[in-house]
């Protein structure tokens, strides 16, 4: 049964034990080089920093606001966005850390803090020449363990963000497959190296035992000669 926010009370309806809800998100930035320094301020790039849901859903169902803390050199460095898209677009010339804080509609749910290093440059020549957008984005998960009754309702009643195709700059599913393949290959390589080392160790032990037997035999021969 759907309840209005005021009906939950000051404790947001209390904690719902044994419930875990995971909300995957994507955060990061895109940047494009102007091609040269801008005469009026020396800025070289336009960039956008953002937080968005990994799945196609409207986060405003449970997110009250998202705060972006920019470098102090920007006017009004503390930017607040209260509805999707949760993003800030600016221009600049340098990279710096952006502190992102996600606040929830439920006042009893603690905010989530993310740290993102704004990326403007990369070694790719095409990107440096402005032919390609620089992308630096990451997958993360907000895990709500024993949420309040209010938060549980908010988290499970969100709607789709868009009716059209929904995708990210990075193909995370493809990246996950590639990462798993790399881990599997590394695991196989490590197993092979361990097996190889065990064989070497076994051969070394056999060599040592042979040498010990030869030494013992020589000692026994010397003792026999003395007699």
Swiss-Prot record:
Region Interaction with MLLT10, annotated ranges: 163-227
The reported effect of residue 43 to A is: Impaired binding to histone H3 succinylated at 'Lys-122' (H3K122succ)
The record's listing under Pfam families reads: YEATS
Q: Where in this chain does the record put each YEATS domain?
A: 15-158
Per UniProt, the keywords (alphabetical) are: Chromatin regulator, Coiled coil, Growth regulation, Isopeptide bond, Nucleus, Transcription, Transcription regulation, Ubl conjugation
Q: Name one GO molecular function term.
A: histone H3K27ac reader activity
Region annotated Interaction with TACC1 sits at: 168-227
Q: Which residues form a coiled coil?
A: 178-226
The entry's localization annotation reads: Nucleus
Alphabetized PROSITE patterns for the sequence: YEATS
How would you summarize where this protein is expressed among tissues?
Answer: Expressed in brain, heart, kidney, liver, lung, pancreas, placenta and skeletal muscle.
Any Gene Ontology biological process: positive regulation of DNA-templated transcription
Q: Which parts of the sequence are marked as the site Interacts with diacetylated histone H3?
A: 73
Fetch the InterPro entries from UniProt. Answer: YEAST_sf (IPR038704), YEATS (IPR005033), YEATS_dom (IPR055129)
Q: What is its main location?
A: nucleus
Known function: Chromatin reader component of the NuA4 histone acetyltransferase (HAT) complex, a complex involved in transcriptional activation of select genes principally by acetylation of nucleosomal histones H4 and H2A. Specifically recognizes and binds acylated histone H3, with a preference for histone H3 diacetylated at 'Lys-18' and 'Lys-27' (H3K18ac and H3K27ac) or histone H3 diacetylated at 'Lys-14' and 'Lys-27' (H3K14ac and H3K27ac). Also able to recognize and bind crotonylated histone H3.
Q: Which PANTHER family match?
A: PROTEIN AF-9 HOMOLOG (PTHR47573:SF1)
Per the entry's comment, what about the domains? The YEATS domain specifically recognizes and binds acylated histones, with a preference for histone H3 diacetylated at 'Lys-14' and 'Lys-27' (H3K14ac and H3K27ac).
- State the name under which the record lists this protein: YEATS domain-containing protein 4
Please tell me the species this chain comes from.
Homo sapiens
Instruction: Tell me what gene encodes this.
Output: YEATS4
């Amino acid at each position: 049964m759907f309840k209005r926010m005021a009906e939950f009370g000051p404790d947001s309806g209390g904690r719902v034990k044994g419930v875990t809800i995971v909300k995957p998100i994507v955060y990061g930035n895109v940047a494009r080089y102007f091609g040269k320094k801008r005469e009026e301020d020396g800025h070289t790039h336009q960039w956008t920093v953002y937080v968005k849901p990994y799945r196609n859903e409207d986060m405003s169902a449970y997110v009250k606001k998202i705060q972006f803390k920019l470098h102090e050199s920007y006017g009004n460095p503390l930017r607040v966005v209260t509805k999707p898209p949760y993003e800030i677009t600016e221009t600049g010339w340098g990279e710096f850390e952006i502190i992102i804080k996600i606040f929830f509609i439920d006042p009893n749910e603690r905010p989530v803090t993310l740290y993102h290093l704004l990326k403007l440059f990369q070694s790719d020549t095409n990107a440096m020449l402005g032919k390609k957008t620089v992308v630096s984005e990451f997958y993360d998960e907000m895990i709500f363990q024993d949420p309040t009754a209010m938060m549980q309702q908010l988290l499970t009643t969100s709607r789709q963000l868009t009716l059209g195709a929904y995708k990210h700059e990075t193909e995370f599913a493809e990246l996950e497959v590639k990462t798993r393949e790399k881990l599997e290959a590394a695991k196989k390589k490590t197993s092979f190296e361990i097996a190889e080392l065990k064989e070497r160790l076994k051969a070394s032990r056999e060599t040592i035992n042979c040498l010990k037997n030869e030494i013992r035999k020589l000692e026994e021969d010397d003792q026999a000669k003395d007699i």
